[in-house]
Structures are given as structure tokens and as C-alpha cells.
């Protein structure tokens, strides 16, 4: 008679996660051509249970985030991931469940909206930072053993760049066929109404030398200081408010934006070039996944992943 602890243990969810992680990493070289600024990142929220014993771990999770300039490129990458998941599950005596966290479409531009928005930005001027903000910024530089600067903020924050000039700078870095770059969730709105994205300078410190990068906490620290962060919010709100007033008071501006939207979408919402939402109509919000839990203890404020 053989003791249960002496028999071979079946592979389980940790093996599945490891195989999926490593094999998909290797397959990245073959998923798509090396062009288009696409990225594929992964995160392991769950890998087994609390302790190791002779029972095969029953659950593991692996989350992927894909950014690419076209939807077919995204689909090609996820086709590879789907096949890998199916084969890994078969190899490890597991079942696989696939679920979306979110899916977004590529953005639909609207030059008419961009023009009226930038016109207001020009009238209002770029944000400016007072001495109180600069004092805090210099203190941050000093805490990093840097020589505090007379003007610690990146000089480009107070200069306005026309959207067509910014577009040209982006295009210089991209292949000619690529129309979209990076990712955000606001882009889904662009398929339902004329939309413009507004970039306003966020407090950023001037680098002491080429190639230097401040740690992330510096950016977050300035985000909690009104003197540093308020110029961005205040200027953005002023530009948005004046743009809305223009659209409400001048019907020709609104009609121009709506006409461009209809043209780009092939007739508007539901048109020949319109892209429908990528998530199904019965999609349930992904609220059941693990998030850090913040708690107050006698030792102070802590967090844990339950």
C-alpha cells in the first residue's frame, strides 16, 4: 500500500500559469511583426493557495494587457494566447476560463473640435506655477541629492503646442501606415459623439541632465500639493468650459464638428465606418477580481492582497 504523499502529484494551476507565462513570452517574437509600437504585458494575480502540500494547486490566474494600433493586430495576438491557454490546460489537467476586463476601440479624431478647443487654450494661455510650487519642487530635488534649480519645472509645460504640430512630432516616430498610438479609455466616447482630447501640462520636474529620470513618487508627491497640481486642473477646466460655451453659442461650430463625425463614421453612429463597442451588451463589470485591501492597524495604515 502506497501512502498518498508518496505518489506522483498531478500538475496543477501553478504549472499552468508558469507554462502559459513562459510559452507566451517566447511566442511574442512570432505574434506580430516588430512595428507599430505594440505592447503585451502580463500580471499574475493568483498562483496557488496559501501553502504547499501534495495537493495540486487548484487555481491560478494570468492577466494580459494588449496595446496595438489596429484591432486586427490585437486579435492576432489574442488568438495566440487563446491557443496557448487551451494547450496548457490540457497538459496540466486544468480547465481554462477566459474573460475580458475591458476592450476599447481605436480613437476617432475630430479636427473641428481640436481647432475650437485650441483656440480657447490660446486665449487663456498655458498653466503657470507660482513660487510656492517651485519651493516644493526644489525641496524634492534636494531630497534626491540634486542641486535645486531656480526654475525646477520642465519648461515645455508653459508653452502651447498646436495639435497639428504635436501630431507631426508623433508621426515622425511612427511608420507611415500607423494611424493610432498608445491607449486610453476615453476613446470609446469618440465613436458616439464628436470628441477632443485635451492635454494640459502636469507638474513635471526638469531633468538635471540628459537621460535622468525622477522616481515615480516625485510625480505622485506633486499631485498631492495644491500649488503644484491646481494649475493643471484649473486651466483644463477653463478651456473645457469656454469650449462648451462656444459650441452652445455658435451653431456653426457644433455643426462643423458633427459633420466631421458623420463623415469619419460613415454616416454617424451605426454608419458604414462606425465601430461598435467591443464588449458584449450583457457584459458584467469585472468587480470580482482581487484588489489590494487597505486597513488601519496598531502599526499604522497597511495593505494586503486578500
Regions found by a protein language model. Give the residues of each.
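An extended, acidic, His-containing surface patch that forms the Zn2+-binding/catalytic region
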Residues: 104-306
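Midchain, well-structured core segments that form catalytic/ion-binding scaffolds
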Residues: 1-145
